[in-house]
A protein has these predicted regions:
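Short, low-complexity, polybasic intrinsically disordered segments
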Residues: 128-150
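Amphipathic alpha-helical surface "interface" segments used
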Residues: 77-84, 126-134
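Histidine-centered catalytic/metal-coordination loop motif
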Residues: 15-112, 117, 148
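Structural motif
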Residues: 7, 29-31, 133-136
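Single conserved hydrophobic/aromatic residue that forms the stacking wall/gate
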Residues: 1-12
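Catalytic phosphate/metal-binding cores of nucleic-acid and nucleotide-processing enzymes, i.e., regions
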Residues: 120-124
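Conserved beta-strand segments that form the floor/walls of ligand-binding pockets within enzyme
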Residues: 11, 35, 128
Length: 150
């Protein structure tokens, strides 16, 4: 069985390593799409209970809702920290920024939560993060590849 869930959050970041205008501070209303798999439906005929995913929803909000994400190796870290100290931004420090890394980060967090709640019955098949209609990245569970017949 497979089930999708979508969530939107607004964040700001820059890609300081980029040679293009992407190295400038800019923001997105990110859309997260999570696909869950299971060995079968539960007693309520659900793959997962979305009402029970409050921890994941709160984590997404904490990480990506009106936040400024900065990479640990950003050469302007001191400047970004100054903005945080002046309460001008709500900073989150991550290993790297971008759709690919946000998909991976969210996949890891969601997988941990789903395993804690459901054990082996459910898992995260994939996480897609969209910046806009023309740019997205997907992190796929390579241990449990998506079965199109589910």
């Amino acid at each position: 069985h497979r089930l999708n869930r979508r969530q939107r959050q607004m964040c700001i970041r820059d890609r300081w390593r980029a040679d293009s205008h992407c190295n400038l501070i800019h923001g997105y209303a990110l859309q997260f799409e999570l696909t869950f798999g299971s060995t079968g439906l539960d007693e309520k005929n659900w793959v997962v209970d979305f009402g029970g995913l409050k921890e994941l929803k709160e984590w997404l909000k904490h990480m990506f809702d009106h936040t400024y994400l900065v990479a640990t190796d950003d050469p302007e870290m001191a400047t970004v920290q100054l903005l945080e100290e002046k309460n001008l931004i709500d900073m989150r420090v991550v290993d790297a920024v971008g759709c690919e890394r946000f998909a991976e980060l969210t996949f890891d967090k969601a997988s941990s939560i789903i395993e804690k709640l459901y054990g082996d019955r459910c898992w995260v098949e994939s996480v897609t993060v969209r910046e806009h209609e023309a740019n997205s990245a997907t992190c796929v569970n390579m241990e449990r590849p998506i079965n199109e017949e589910s």
